[in-house]
């Protein structure tokens, strides 16, 4: 099998790639794709070493709707639990000649390492706190649908920046298109090392002033060691209607899910464009699978 292109990080994409994927995703949303079974007779293996509802279901539905044969391996009963090395497992699966492997793993950077041992297309469905490129592509599509362009938009990413792969991928992608990016987080959850970020804030109301887009992040308790008060977090960093009034009147509020209601966001604004993100995520993953098979 010829070596095909991977999607491991946002840096794998050019502006042209993003625009082409976005165009394809819009065609899938509008049901205007001429050959919707572009993956007929292709084999897609889903390997999710972390729990997932949205991303796993989205990739599985996307691949099946494009005509692929999809195998989602039950990790808890796989050879990994018998002590097999992850690299050996990937090499074994690669020997079966799949066309794609879609992998989620708790270890940052691991998928870049695994890519050296496969000759199929490899897609990163989230690796630790490193990257989640298809989520960023879906978020880009949502923002474009509301704001038409990214350049000079004030986009505020708020919450658990330190542990967030969604934040990292969005920062890198949105900056490619000229966004002005601000981060809001408690000091213990802030990450100060992004050259692409324009400003850091420790106050939510200060950070979202005149924001065009507010992107909230889940508080990732599974990656944290302390037990900070959820009530205190919501008081300081949870978004409600009163705090939202500091943003622009037409600001959109996003969240990659799953939502912790009453922690990151109040019930009265929790249903903003979040389900649209899910819908656009499915179209985006169809577009990515379609695009990678042709490059």
Curated annotation (Swiss-Prot):
* UniProt keyword NADP present: no
Would you name any one GO CC term? Answer: cytosol
Q: Which PROSITE patterns match?
A: CARBAMOYLTRANSFERASE (PS00097)
Q: Pfam families, from UniProt? A: OTCace, OTCace_N
UniProt-listed Enzyme Commission number(s): 2.1.3.2
- From which organism does this entry originate? Wolbachia pipientis subsp. Culex pipiens (strain wPip)
Catalytic activity reported? carbamoyl phosphate + L-aspartate = N-carbamoyl-L-aspartate + phosphate + H(+)
Keywords on record: Pyrimidine biosynthesis, Transferase
Q: In which pathway does it act?
A: Pyrimidine metabolism; UMP biosynthesis via de novo pathway; (S)-dihydroorotate from bicarbonate: step 2/3
Q: How does this chain assemble? A: Heterododecamer (2C3:3R2) of six catalytic PyrB chains organized as two trimers (C3), and six regulatory PyrI chains organized as three dimers (R2).
What is this protein for, i.e. what is its function?
Answer: Catalyzes the condensation of carbamoyl phosphate and aspartate to form carbamoyl aspartate and inorganic phosphate, the committed step in the de novo pyrimidine nucleotide biosynthesis pathway.
Residues reported in the UniProt entry to bind carbamoyl phosphate: 54-55, 104, 132, 135, 257-258
Record InterPro entries: Asp/Orn_carbamoyltranf_P-bd, Asp/Orn_carbamoylTrfase, Asp/Orn_carbamoylTrfase_sf, Asp_carbamoyltransf, Asp_carbamoyltransf_Asp/Orn-bd
Protein family per UniProt: Belongs to the aspartate/ornithine carbamoyltransferase superfamily. ATCase family.
User: What's an example GO BP annotation here?
Assistant: 'de novo' UMP biosynthetic process
Write down what this protein is called: Aspartate carbamoyltransferase catalytic subunit
Residues binding L-aspartate: 82, 165, 218
Gene3D superfamilies, per this entry? Aspartate/ornithine carbamoyltransferase
Top-rank taxon: Bacteria
GO molecular-function terms, A-Z: amino acid binding; aspartate carbamoyltransferase activity
